UniProtKB/Swiss-Prot annotation:
Binding sites annotated in the UniProt record for heme: 123, 127
Family designation: Belongs to the CcmE/CycJ family.
Segments on the Periplasmic face: 30-156
Gene: ccmE2
Domain of life the protein comes from: Bacteria
Topological region Cytoplasmic: 1-8
Full protein name: Cytochrome c-type biogenesis protein CcmE 2
UniProt GO molecular function: heme binding; metal ion binding
Native source species: Xanthomonas euvesicatoria pv. vesicatoria (strain 85-10)
Length: 156
């Protein structure tokens, strides 16, 4: 093999190796930042994984919100109509956060409690995030829950 071919072979091998390394690093970064959406029923079934980071979607159960006077930490339950999951959050809640409203929280399970890192609340009476609406639609139909449109199980 002449020197020019050998140099070209090393260059091609180096480029393939660098491309593989870059692909691996991108895949690892994306995997760490992906947070799948689960309902309380799916979490309690074990679909979310014991220590993985995920998003919890559902409705804030009426009468479940608790916060000590002067404290930032809040506790509440998120429900999908079939199951409830306790949530703990130690930051400032969004202005639109209310009981009976849709919420999506990102965090992890710790000792049977979902410890949220971030909480998003819906922005008006009729809006519900599409992912939450899709996952909760069957629970709403099952329990004949009326929606803003006035029909049971129909989420918009």
């Amino acid at each position: 093999m002449n020197p020019q071919r050998r140099r070209r072979l090393w260059l091609v091998l180096a480029l393939v190796l660098a491309g593989g390394l870059a692909t691996t690093l991108v895949a690892m970064a994306l995997q760490r930042n992906v947070a799948y959406l689960y309902t309380p029923s799916e979490v309690l079934r074990g679909d979310a994984g014991a220590h993985s980071r995920f998003r919890l979607g559902g409705m804030v159960e009426k009468g479940s919100f608790k916060r000590a006077s002067g404290a930032l930490e809040a506790q509440f339950r998120v429900t999908d109509g079939d199951a409830q999951l306790p949530v703990s959050y130690d930051r400032i809640l969004p202005d639109l956060f209310r009981e009976g409203q849709a919420v999506v929280a990102t965090g992890r399970m710790q000792n049977g409690i979902f410890v949220a890192e971030d909480v998003l609340a819906k922005h008006d009476e009729t809006y519900m995030p599409k992912e939450v609406a899709d996952k909760m639609g069957s629970a709403h139909r099952k329990h004949d829950v009326p929606t803003a449109a006035g029909q049971a199980g129909e989420l918009h």
